[in-house]
């Protein structure tokens, strides 16, 4: 496969046709989620009947519930150093990763990605590095890692890929409509002259402008042109990776991907594994039950009057007057022949429709593995133990989703850490929002200073940075400024530089709910009992390590931060025998000055008792 228009269009066609059924299924589920499942003909029929297009949206109900649940799980990306000498650098890298997540407002963006994964089965995010336009004092660019949610309907996948994280794919296509101004900004003014506005040259339904926008943007005085652009990333037969922007028969932009360790600028994670080429979300088996509920609601609307009257010809003078009087709560209805009128109760049919709804909801809960206790709808007579067991059963059944979300976070964190290591080369100060200790600031790439050989007027030695030619992190070539001068940058202090450190990425998942109260109580009992007291007296450093392990098992929002503090304290005590002795004495209840407790002290005597 080569990075030319012919191969790109062929791979697009192959990928689209391979996953066409999955795309249509995902669109149907999205329509159910957004209450767009009624066609125009069906809406017209309901309007003629005077019925509302009512629905009990189960897809949206459980989507919000699952997204809300996973929002309570704090997935913390942890970069662990491979070499002990990189401990300080790993701390700075973790702070930089946290800054990137906060800067991209991932608390909101992450919920959007998780919703897309639940509905369509694809968790997708674009990860790019952009130049902020700012420069440090030495002229080096200050870069920023940027996240962007990607709708699954815009993506075309490689059918040869077999990995759930899409790591073995040969290509990925993303098509999107861009405004005229955006095209000029990205590709130049001449590109607009070579393109046709509102032309779907891909010949696929999802690529129609009206698919997501309903109509073309036409104002009173002008038409706002939009153009269909495809962004393709691929690996050619020589192992080189390319980023290609093309439209119809025009290659707008073709560049080599310079990310050294991240393969694609897109992070993909499929929610389910399958033996055929498909992807789907958690609501595949729920869709038909959702339609059954909607149909039952429509029938209930037709049965809003629980009685029907069968009138024989000639039994009443005026059928319209009879209808009006019959529908009144209290009415005197004149008739000619009472035997020609039959009243039939419809309550049986109404109960049947409610049974359909109840059974459908029960099937949906069983398919999703979600019980009433997890939904907060347990019976008041249920014991707390029963509720906890049922909630734990739901959490176990949702593990297949939890594992894929954690895998996505780990892959995204790994991409972020590697991009930071490659592109964050400028001297900059980053603010880290820490809810425990408040805001903190870290300085990346702090210049190493050397003695300049002179003193200032106050007798203080003058320092200067050690300058060397700066290398472009993308191309590996010597950097030059706008005037063609070589950019000289300082050698950085090793503790503040991330360029040469080695790390591994893991995920610390902590759910701050109270599902493990019993286990937490048992741990607290051990820590505060005789074993814990003896441990604090004999081995204070080990006691802090035990406390860190106990805190790690507690699913609270601040568990990772408290665990880090406890581990730091244990390390401090382990390397300082004097501090360890003082901690042991404090655990024994030592008095000031180190004097032992008096053995002659007794409880005060009760004056009402006789003296023995």
Where are these regions (language model features)?
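Helix N-terminus capping/helix-initiation residues
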Residues: 57, 66, 151, 177-179, ...
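Generic detector of short, locally flexible boundary/turn motifs and exposed helical patches
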Residues: 42-44, 87-93, 205-211, 258-260, ...
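C-terminal anchoring/interaction modules
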Residues: 1-49, 125, 134-140, 162, ...
């Amino acid at each position: 496969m080569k990075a030319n228009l012919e191969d790109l269009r062929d791979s697009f066609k192959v990928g689209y046709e391979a996953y066409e059924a999955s795309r249509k299924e995902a669109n149907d589920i999205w329509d159910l989620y957004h209450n767009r499942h009624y066609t125009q003909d069906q809406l017209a029929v309901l309007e003629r009947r005077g019925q509302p297009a009512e629905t009990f949206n189960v897809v949206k109900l459980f989507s919000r519930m699952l997204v809300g649940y996973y929002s309570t799980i704090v997935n913390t990306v942890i970069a662990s150093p491979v070499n002990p000498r990189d401990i300080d650098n790993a701390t700075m890298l973790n702070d930089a990763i946290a800054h990137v997540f906060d800067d991209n407002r991932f608390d909101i963006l992450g919920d959007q990605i998780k919703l897309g994964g639940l509905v369509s089965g694809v968790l997708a995010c674009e990860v790019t590095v952009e130049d902020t336009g700012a420069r440090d004092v030495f002229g080096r660019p200050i870069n920023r890692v940027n996240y962007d949610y990607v709708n699954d309907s815009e993506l075309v996948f490689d059918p040869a890929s077999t990995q759930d994280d899409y790591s073995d794919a040969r290509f990925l296509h993303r098509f999107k409509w861009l405004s005229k101004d955006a095209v000029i900004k990205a590709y130049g003014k001449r590109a607009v002259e070579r393109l046709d506005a509102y032309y779907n040259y891909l010949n696929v339904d999802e690529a129609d402008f009206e698919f997501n926008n309903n109509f073309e943007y036409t104002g009173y005085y002008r038409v706002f042109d939009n153009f269909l652009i495809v962004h393709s990333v691929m690996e050619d037969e020589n192992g080189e990776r390319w980023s290609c922007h093309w439209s119809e028969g025009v290659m707008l932009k073709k560049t080599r991907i310079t990310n050294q360790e991240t393969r694609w600028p897109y992070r993909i994670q499929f929610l389910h594994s399958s033996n055929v080429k498909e992807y789907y979300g958690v609501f595949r088996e729920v869709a038909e039950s959702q339609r059954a509920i909607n149909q039952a609601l429509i029938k209930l609307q037709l049965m809003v009057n629980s009685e029907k009257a069968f009138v024989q010809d000639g039994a009443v003078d005026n059928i319209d007057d009879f209808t009006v009087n019959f529908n009144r709560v209290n009415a005197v209805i004149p008739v000619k022949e009472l035997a020609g009128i039959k009243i039939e109760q419809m309550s049986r049919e109404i109960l049947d429709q409610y049974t359909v709804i109840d059974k459908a909801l029960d099937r949906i809960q069983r398919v999703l593995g979600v019980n009433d206790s997890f939904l907060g709808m347990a019976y008041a007579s249920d014991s707390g133990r029963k509720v906890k067991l049922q909630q734990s059963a739901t959490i176990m059944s949702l593990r297949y989703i939890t594992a894929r979300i954690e895998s996505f976070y780990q892959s995204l964190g790994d991409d972020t850490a590697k991009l930071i290591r490659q592109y964050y080369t400028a001297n900059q100060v980053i603010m880290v929002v820490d809810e425990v200790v408040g805001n903190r600031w870290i300085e990346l790439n702090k210049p190493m200073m050397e003695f300049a050989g002179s003193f200032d007027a106050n007798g203080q030695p003058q320092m200067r940075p050690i300058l060397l030619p700066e290398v472009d992190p993308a191309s590996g070539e010597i950097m030059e400024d706008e005037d063609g001068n070589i950019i000289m940058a300082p050698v950085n202090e090793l503790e503040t530089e991330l360029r040469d450190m080695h790390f591994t990425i893991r995920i610390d998942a902590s759910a701050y709910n109270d599902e493990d109260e019993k286990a937490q109580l048992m741990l607290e009992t051990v820590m505060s009992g005789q074993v814990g007291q003896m441990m604090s007296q004999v081995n204070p450093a080990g006691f802090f390590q035990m406390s860190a392990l106990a805190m790690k098992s507690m699913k609270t929002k601040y568990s990772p931060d408290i665990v880090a503090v406890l581990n730091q304290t244990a390390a401090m005590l382990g390397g300082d025998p004097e501090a360890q002795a003082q901690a042991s004495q404090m655990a024994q209840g030592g008095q000031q000055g180190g004097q032992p407790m008096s053995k002659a002290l007794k409880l005060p005597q009760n004056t009402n008792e006789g003296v023995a």
